[in-house]
């Protein structure tokens, strides 16, 4: 989708956080039948998120990992299984864990566990964002058309500046991926940005962490 964007806003407004959506071990396991449909090169796009994670750490930008997880009796799936997805991300499956090796996930990192598509729904995500004094959400992960999109919309409706790193998200299909990017761009002009643009903005980002704001 990359093209010149007409936006009155900077890529990063105020204080940023990198939001890593649902990049879990399951995505890097080869199976004959996948519980969730994925577009081609899905795993390669997810692996690219490591570049953004490393740069965020280097620049003092907080990294927040989002993990989808469901109880083994399926009681919290709700209507989720009425669509194209099969049972996935169960608590007792080791592949439900964040892809620690691929992403350099650390025990000290921020982690939000969710039961539904949006990272905001039924979680303490917004409490964490307020504590970190975050203004801009830099989103990567999957699916573009599901959890990334729903999180973007809830962030938008909560008045956060929302950006999607195009190279580091992937959808259930190429068509769904592109449609979701267009839908998010409709909400905030300039929302969809390349990895290189985002890395450059991170490099120039002033560390406005709560600690520095108090100085």
PLM features per residue range, with description:
Residues 1-17, 54, 58-59, 82-215:
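Active-site-adjacent betaalpha module
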Residues 14, 32-56, 60-68:
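A short alpha/beta connector and helix-capping loop motif
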